[in-house]
């Protein structure tokens, strides 16, 4: 029996009568992607070991040896010298095996009162907590870039659209502030998600807890968790916190995708509202004149990638009975890639927005088309006593006449306007034309949330204060 205890094999191999096949080893191993968790795995193990020593479950000398060994392993990992082994399955057993090789039996005592089930759940939460904080910072950087651009263009007039048809004049600054609002809600979702991530699973062991006199609250305090997972079965089995983060990330990417669609449209020569810096574009291998907006196009495409990860994680969880199942090994790659995709995209977009070249004249020329001030004419009539529905009908008839002539409402003389609006001619005075200018239109929307330059600047100031 003694010889069997010292026989080399997997951490659980004593139960089995034959070794795992090489094909199954490759199929079930996760070390070449979950090694990303190595540093948080060490952090969690050190907190666990300190608690074991404080509770007299392991000796103080064992703790000292574990701390010394882990410091060496951390250095090896950071220097790229650590040798990851497929035969050891995952990040946890690779580190434990190296620790035991360095310090002997003390390394074997580290796993007392712990399972890989609660260990990996702790690792993921520790890692994801840090990534949420990083993404929150990147969302702040993007919003800051948008606010800078919005402030510079508080009075730059462009057409506002509904159904991709010219609707009413707005300012470019106001348009950009819409995305600031979206990304602000994204940041709030990340903060809210973090609250549920920041709970300690360690101590749940495999599923039922442990018979050792552990102190979960001490470990939670050491690792900076807000509290512990209240139920051991739930602690090791559910990945709803990862799903919630991925859902929040999918919304970030959805907002990025909407913005990307507009950047691509605005940069098109047929629109020409903006230009992107060359470093964010590519050329064509056959057409020498091309400058393609590859970054926003690729971000638009990567949104589908993150959406796919969300569906993958939801599908992963939906059929699992309690408690832990091997299915959960598949949670990491979608989660890791979601973090990478969102973080890289936000970082690139913050820099890209700062380098946007705005073409105010092209925006203004476009806003002069499509009868963008027709609603202002209707409002003019309403303010002189006409019911809005009657004003709407009268202006719509005038628009139809102008469309047939190929002119704008502002191109009509006062006499022509009174003629086309004969039923309400008595309400139309010389001042009507001030309502039909682009500047007059945007200036009239002077209320919180409106597009007036004054309101845009106030909104920028408020948003900057909120970011502090």
From Swiss-Prot:
Domain of life: Bacteria
Pathway annotation from the record: Amino-acid biosynthesis; L-arginine biosynthesis; L-arginine from L-ornithine and carbamoyl phosphate: step 3/3
Annotated Gene3D superfamilies: Fumarase/aspartase (C-terminal domain) (1.10.40.30), Fumarase/aspartase (Central domain) (1.20.200.10), Fumarase/aspartase (N-terminal domain) (1.10.275.10)
PROSITE patterns, A to Z: FUMARATE_LYASES
Places the protein is found: Cytoplasm
SUPFAM superfamilies reported in the protein's UniProt record: L-aspartase-like
Its EC number(s): 4.3.2.1
MF-aspect GO terms: argininosuccinate lyase activity
Protein biosynthesis found in the keyword field: no
GO annotation (BP), single: L-arginine biosynthetic process
Keywords: Amino-acid biosynthesis, Arginine biosynthesis, Cytoplasm, Lyase
GO cellular component: cytosol
Reactions this protein catalyses: 2-(N(omega)-L-arginino)succinate = fumarate + L-arginine
Record-linked HAMAP family: Arg_succ_lyase
NCBIfam families for the chain: argH
Name of the molecule in the record: Argininosuccinate lyase
């Amino acid at each position: 029996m003694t010889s069997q205890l010292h026989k080399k094999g997997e951490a659980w191999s004593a139960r089995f009568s034959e070794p795992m096949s090489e094909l199954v080893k490759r199929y079930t191993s996760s070390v070449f992607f979950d090694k990303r968790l190595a540093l948080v795995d060490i952090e969690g193990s050190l907190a666990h070991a300190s608690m074991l020593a404080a509770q007299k479950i392991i000796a103080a000398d064992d703790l000292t040896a574990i701390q010394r060994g882990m410091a060496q392993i951390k250095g090896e990992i950071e220097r790229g010298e650590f040798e990851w082994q497929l035969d050891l399955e995952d990040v946890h057993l690779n580190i434990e095996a190296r620790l035991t090789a360095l310090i002997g039996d003390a390394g074997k005592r580290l796993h007392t009162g712990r399972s890989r089930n609660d260990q990996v759940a702790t690792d993921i939460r520790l890692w994801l907590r840090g990534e949420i904080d990083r993404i929150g910072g990147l969302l702040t950087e993007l919003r800051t870039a948008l606010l800078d651009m919005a402030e510079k263009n508080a009075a730059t007039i462009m057409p506002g659209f509904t159904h991709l048809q010219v609707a009413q004049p707005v300012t470019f600054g106001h348009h950009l502030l819409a995305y600031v609002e979206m990304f602000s809600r994204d940041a709030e979702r990340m903060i809210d998600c973090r609250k549920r991530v920041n709970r300690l699973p360690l101590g749940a062991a495999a599923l039922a807890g442990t018979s050792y006199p552990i102190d979960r609250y001490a470990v939670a305090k050491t690792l900076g968790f807000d509290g512990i997972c209240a139920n051991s079965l739930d602690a090791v089995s559910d990945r709803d916190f990862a799903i919630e983060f991925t859902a929040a990330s999918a919304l970030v990417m959805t907002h990025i995708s909407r913005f990307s669609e507009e950047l691509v449209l605005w940069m098109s020569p047929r629109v020409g509202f903006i230009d992107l810096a060359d470093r964010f574009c590519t050329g064509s291998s056959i057409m020498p004149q091309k400058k393609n907006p590859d970054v926003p196009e690729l971000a638009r495409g990567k949104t589908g990638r993150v959406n796919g990860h969300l569906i993958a994680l939801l599908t992963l969880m939906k059929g699992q009975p309690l408690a832990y199942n091997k299915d959960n090994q598949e949670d990491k790659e979608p989660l890791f890639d979601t973090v990478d995709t969102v973080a890289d995209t936000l970082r690139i977009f913050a820099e890209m927005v700062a380098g946007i070249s705005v073409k105010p004249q092209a925006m203004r020329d476009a806003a002069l088309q499509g009868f963008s001030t027709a609603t202002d004419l209707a409002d003019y009539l309403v303010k002189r006593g006409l019911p809005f529905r009657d004003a709407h009908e009268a202006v719509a008839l005038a628009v139809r006449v102008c469309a047939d002539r190929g002119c704008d409402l502002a191109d009509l003389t006062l006499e022509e306007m009174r003629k086309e609006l004969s039923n309400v001619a008595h309400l139309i005075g010389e001042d009507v034309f001030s309502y039909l200018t682009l500047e007059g239109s945007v200036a009239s929307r002077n209320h919180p949330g409106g597009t007036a330059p004054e309101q845009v600047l106030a909104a920028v100031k408020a948003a900057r204060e909120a970011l502090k």
